[in-house]
């Protein structure tokens, strides 16, 4: 027997899961939290194995929008206010029910929750916080949760979501501020970067107070430390007030009537200036390093009343830590005229200044058939998206920098060669590499040698010299590496 309420819920699920398919969530949880007796869910299993649909969606997560209603009119978005599409919204209880029922049936390993803007950023974010609270506290859901932070929402609501979610993300949307103004005039770079900074500062505090429970570091951070590079984020630590820590750990009390106007001082968070021009509207390409250092990443005044310090230590369960799986973001590629060089420079700045775990790249799809947007004769730029992901991997794990891979004179990747091979062919003076003498960082720059195989080479050399057969056994892709090693 099918009840009418169940039928309506399934219709909502069909609409809101389809509306969420353009949000990228294909990543492991990054959380080492086992199952707990009396609770439901295991965040570790979520990080072990994911299944992906043909279009790249992560199907092991229940990936839905809370609502596809939206007050904004972004030209690239299927859910923009001017579109005539079926509209619906979940309630917090419905999201909890779907998540728990799908998890019990082993259909999913966690929840990915994003949303359009219903009435206002604060109103929408409060509904999301209510949903996360009920999942964690009422239903004792211990699985993985990835939650989107709504740009423009109050600092208190963003922090509250961070105590319940494993990962949070704020979509950058487009690489440059000029592109954002052109295609998403209702959004601002300030409203996007403000919660990013808040989450980054909160994670740093959580790590300091809770150790590893406060969250693990990003791959980019570890790579930078290995190479002896300084991370700009470490220059801006915030020390929490000791009076906020300790005492009784009160259960969350649902906050009502906490909506704030867009002019509320809560939005004016303290933001330090940066050293990269690439997030400014007037960016014309990377110039000299000295000139870049004098350019702010975002022009924001310092406000004495604003603070990124965590304030809810005694109001929530802090055992999970604050956003322990880190934060990520997503950029649409190909909707505006940015070069690959500009895009990778933006990503590099985000890794350095906001401690991001991942930057996701989404090939532009003209879902609205907007004639003013770039024509897609050959379909979405999927190969370009793939090259950006490969280059992003080189930044995070291999120690490359954006200005090594590309330049103003050569601002786009070679579509026929992966970025690492392309770089090697442009730097033949560094090759061939003596496989039995080269250090770990040098080995990483050899095409065909990855992070694991480079480590195996270093360890295997302690037992004797290596030949090509040994390298093949280790896992080196010889058909690429053979031209660059000796």
Give the ranges of each region predicted by the language model.
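Low-complexity, acidic/Ser/Thr- and charged residue-rich accessory regions of DNA metabolism proteins
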Residues: 368, 472-486
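Flexible, acidic/Gly-rich N-terminal and inter-domain linker regions that tether
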Residues: 1-69
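Canonical Radical SAM [4Fe-4S] cluster-binding loop centered on the CxxxCxxC motif
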Residues: 64-93
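Long, highly charged, low-complexity intrinsically disordered interaction regions
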Residues: 374-445, 480-486
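Conserved AdoMet/S-adenosylmethionine-binding subsite of the radical SAM
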Residues: 119-241, 245, 249-398
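Short Fe-S-cluster ligation motifs
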Residues: 100-114
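Short, charged beta->alpha transition segments
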Residues: 62-64, 93-104, 314
């Amino acid at each position: 027997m099918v009840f009418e309420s169940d039928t309506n819920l399934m219709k909502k699920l069909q609409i809101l899961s389809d509306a969420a398919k353009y949000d990228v969530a294909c990543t492991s949880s990054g959380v080492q939290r086992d199952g707990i007796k009396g609770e439901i869910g295991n965040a570790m299993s979520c990080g072990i194995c994911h299944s992906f649909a043909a279009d790249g969606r992560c199907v092991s997560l229940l990936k839905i929008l809370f609502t596809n209603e939206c007050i904004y009119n972004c030209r690239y978005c299927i859910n923009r206010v001017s579109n005539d599409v079926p509209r619906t919204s979940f309630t917090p209880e419905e999201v909890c029910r779907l998540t728990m029922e799908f998890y019990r049936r082993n259909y999913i390993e966690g929840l990915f929750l994003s949303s359009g803007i219903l009435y206002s950023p604060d109103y929408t974010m409060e509904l999301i916080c209510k949903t996360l609270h009920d999942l964690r506290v009422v239903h004792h859901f211990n699985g993985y949760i990835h939650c989107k932070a709504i740009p423009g929402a109050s600092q208190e609501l963003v922090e509250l979501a961070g105590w319940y979610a494993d990962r949070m993300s704020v979509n950058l949307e487009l690489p440059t501020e000029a592109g954002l103004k052109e295609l998403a005039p209702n959004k601002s770079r300030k409203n996007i970067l403000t919660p990013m900074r808040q989450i980054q500062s909160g994670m740093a505090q959580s790590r300091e107070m809770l150790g590893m429970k406060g969250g693990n570091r990003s791959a980019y951070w570890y790579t930078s430390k290995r190479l002896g590079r300084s991370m700009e984020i470490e220059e801006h630590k915030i020390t929490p007030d000791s009076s906020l820590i300790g005492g009784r750990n009160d259960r969350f009390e649902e906050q009502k009537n906490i909506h704030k106007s867009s002019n509320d001082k809560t939005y004016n968070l303290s933001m330090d200036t940066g050293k990269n021009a690439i997030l400014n509207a007037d960016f014309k390409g990377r110039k000299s390093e000295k000139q870049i250092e004098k350019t702010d990443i975002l022009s924001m005044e310092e406000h004495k009343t604003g603070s990124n310090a965590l304030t809810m230590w005694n109001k929530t369960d802090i055992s999970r830590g604050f956003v322990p799986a880190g934060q990520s973001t997503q950029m649409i590629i190909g909707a505006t005229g940015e070069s690959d060089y500009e895009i990778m420079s933006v990503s590099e700045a985000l890794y350095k200044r906001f401690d991001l775990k991942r930057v996701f790249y989404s090939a532009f799809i003209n879902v609205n058939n907007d004639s003013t947007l770039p024509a897609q004769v050959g379909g979405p730029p999927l190969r370009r998206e793939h090259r950006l992901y490969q280059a992003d991997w080189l930044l995070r794990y291999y120690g490359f920098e954006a200005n090594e891979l590309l330049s103003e004179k050569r601002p786009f990747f070679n579509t026929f060669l992966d970025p690492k091979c392309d770089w090697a062919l442009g730097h033949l003076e560094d090759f061939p590499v003596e496989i039995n003498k080269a250090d770990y960082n040098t080995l990483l720059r050899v095409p065909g040698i990855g992070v694991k195989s480079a480590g195996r080479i270093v360890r295997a050399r302690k037992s004797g010299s290596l030949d090509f057969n040994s390298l093949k056994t280790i896992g080196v892709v010889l058909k690429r590496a053979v031209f660059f090693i000796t």
